[in-house]
A protein has these predicted regions:
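Conserved SAM-binding motif I beta-strand of class I
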Residues: 130-135
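A short, conserved alpha-helix within the catalytic core of class I
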Residues: 184-190
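S-adenosyl-L-methionine
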Residues: 136-172, 176
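N-terminal auxiliary segments of SAM/dcSAM-dependent transferases
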Residues: 1-67
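Conserved SAM-binding loop of SAM-dependent methyltransferases across substrates and taxa
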Residues: 114-126
């Protein structure tokens, strides 16, 4: 195994690490030399983790053990510092899939939020694609960019425009448009001008009334075909040797 391959399996300064305790509680940290992580389980000296293998166990000064792994994007999204309402991992996967975000695509995104959806889109378009984000609230940019850069350090293919997507889109021949805005029906006309023939528009909204208004606006515009409204449900299960039953929480998404 070469040195590059070896380093991929070792924690380095600046890496994100996910600590998991015996009760499967999770703690997201950034590794830094000569730093100490404090929690209710005790102190953990981060120098002990740097240079060691991912997937190792570490003991705090109180005797508690923690498993350290690389966080998935879903882990980071659940733990990320938040401003506006966040889109969770179950929704991100559906959005990328149903919008058919592909490597090399040029994607317009309406709304930046905490940066979770932007990060997922950047991953999906790859180095040869581009994400152009329209955000009206300048105050969300610093926190969102910190989140995005922790997941996708190379943001050279991300362009953020401080502007109102309801007022129109200047770009043309766009492959995909993904909206996470309160009133997506207000953006329909401008998106119709921007999308390439055969392009896809997807809007994520939390209520069925918003779905109805959006669909009616698409139909009235007349340039959009194959309009679909989707609701997906995600339920986790509690599985033991003695019983199998669904968990009590159920998650919904409207597209």
């Amino acid at each position: 195994m070469n040195q590059t391959q070896t380093n991929k399996n070792l924690f380095q300064p600046g890496d994100l690490a996910l600590l998991i305790d015996r009760k499967e509680r999770r703690y997201l940290i950034t590794l830094a030399e000569d730093e100490i992580y404090h929690c209710h389980l005790g102190r953990l000296f981060l120098n002990d983790m740097i240079g060691s293998s991912i997937g190792s166990w570490y003991r705090t000064d109180k005797g508690h053990v923690l498993l350290a792994v690389r966080p998935t994007m879903g882990d980071f999204v659940r733990q990320m510092p938040r401003g506006p309402q966040i889109i969770y991992p179950k929704d991100l996967g559906n959005i990328v899939n149903f919008a058919d975000i592909f490597p090399g695509a040029t994607v317009i995104e309406g709304g930046l939020g905490s940066g979770a959806l932007t990060s997922a889109l950047l991953r999906a378009v790859g180095n040869t694609g581009k994400v152009i984000n329209y955000e009206i609230d300048e105050s969300v940019l610093p926190k969102a960019m910190r989140n995005i850069e922790r997941v996708t350090p190379d943001t050279s293919n991300l362009e953020i425009k401080l502007g109102d997507i309801y007022q129109g889109i200047t770009e043309r021949d766009i492959d995909r448009v993904v909206l996470d805005v309160p009133e997506p029906w207000q953006a329909v006309s401008g998106i119709g001008d921007a999308l390439v023939m055969g392009g896809i528009l997807l809007s994520f909204v939390p209520t069925i009334i918003q779905v109805q208004r959006f669909v009616l606006a698409l139909e009235k515009d007349g340039r959009f075909q194959m309009i679909e409204s989707l609701e997906t449900m995600l339920r986790t299960w509690h599985v033991t040797e003695r019983s199998v039953r669904p968990d009590h929480r159920l998650s919904l998404i409207h597209i």
